[in-house]
């Protein structure tokens, strides 16, 4: 969800509130794409914690304890119901607001269930063409949340909501609740997504270091990118392609280094044989097949985008800063060289007869001129930024890459002496995606002490100490299913 900046603009600020040492003042959005298969959205700044899912049931009634208007809920599991406007008229949008707003919301995940949710301290932290993002505090738990408010077409279910309701992973922003509210105009309906709040973005963290003329510390690049690839492995296993991977959509907690993928406004369940629009993804991070106008692309477009993010963190600037769709392709060719006819056919067969200027590939070691760039990082980049979509690494193959070996070492920690965030709390579902990689993905010190170090054989029974070292998170389920999954990979 890019900001509404002028066409051809650079990556804008995130528009988020100042909340930590990494925070910067909010900025404007970036530009839109152009040329063949031009992106409809540029690499603009985005608002705070965002997400989505389809319009299922859950009517809304909203009220304010300070005497604001109240409304009746409506709608059931078949579609959205109308309630009162959000924020209610008369409720001050400011940090000092003592007003408490109560709505009847539907729980974000699990069986459909409605409950009253009260929140306070409402303030705007982001906006764009998609709508508005507010920050609020849940009255009962005092937990900060982000509330993304988008105009809902009553004729259709909201794809973002449908997708968000089915996703449950420690590296994906969690949908807590959702509710509907009416707008100022007659029959105007809004969907409000109540999401967990994460204070920063990779974009702003990287900009913090860039402004200080520094490159983001390599340990942070490893921790952030590993979690991004893990989130992609999960959503791709669910058949979902994000279609807008960029630093602004990667939320991070600067203290714990936990990363959560957000903004599923462009996401889609890809079905083989069904066409998809090519004018998606912010320009700097668009896979070449999208620039060529392909409509039968795969989730490997997310892998290309992730490769662009990795390169940007290593370089301190975007690797392919095109001013338009065509210029974007020129920037890619300047690094990868002119694609062969076979590579063009793999991206879009309609362009095989198009005459491109013959340019040799630029050596990756010269792309990353700094001697401080680890060879493993360069090797990983080159394996992600491939013209042929099927030649790119899968997200889990990226997680298993030697660039991330440091994270799998016993005793690895963050520069602030905190433990690494949860990296190895794999669910049985994750371990079943590419079982042949499990022997690499699970660090040696977390494997069963009775079995050989590699490959894994009959079981995986981590000790309590090993679980502590793994910083176990919500996805870990030490059950018979885990043992069975690992056993099947031998």
Swiss-Prot record:
Where on this chain does ATP bind? 125-133, 148
Which GO MF term does the entry hold, naming one?
Answer: protein serine kinase activity
Q: Where is this region: Disordered?
A: 1-97, 451-490
UniProt entry keywords in alphabetical sequence: Acetylation, ATP-binding, Carbohydrate metabolism, Glycogen metabolism, Kinase, Neurogenesis, Nucleotide-binding, Phosphoprotein, Serine/threonine-protein kinase, Signal transduction inhibitor, Transferase, Wnt signaling pathway
Q: Where does the record place the Protein kinase domain?
A: 119-404
Q: How is its activity regulated?
A: Activated by phosphorylation at Tyr-279. In response to insulin, inhibited by phosphorylation at Ser-21 by PKB/AKT1; phosphorylation at this site causes a conformational change, preventing access of substrates to the active site. Inhibited by lithium.
Q: Where is the composition biased (Low complexity)?
A: 481-490
Skewed-composition ranges (Gly residues): 1-15, 25-82
List-wise, which residues carry Phosphoserine?
Answer: 2, 21, 72, 77, 97
Functional summary from the UniProt entry:
Constitutively active protein kinase that acts as a negative regulator in the hormonal control of glucose homeostasis, Wnt signaling and regulation of transcription factors and microtubules, by phosphorylating and inactivating glycogen synthase (GYS1 or GYS2), CTNNB1/beta-catenin, APC and AXIN1. Requires primed phosphorylation of the majority of its substrates. Contributes to insulin regulation of glycogen synthesis by phosphorylating and inhibiting GYS1 activity and hence glycogen synthesis. Regulates glycogen metabolism in liver, but not in muscle.
* Protein name (database record): Glycogen synthase kinase-3 alpha
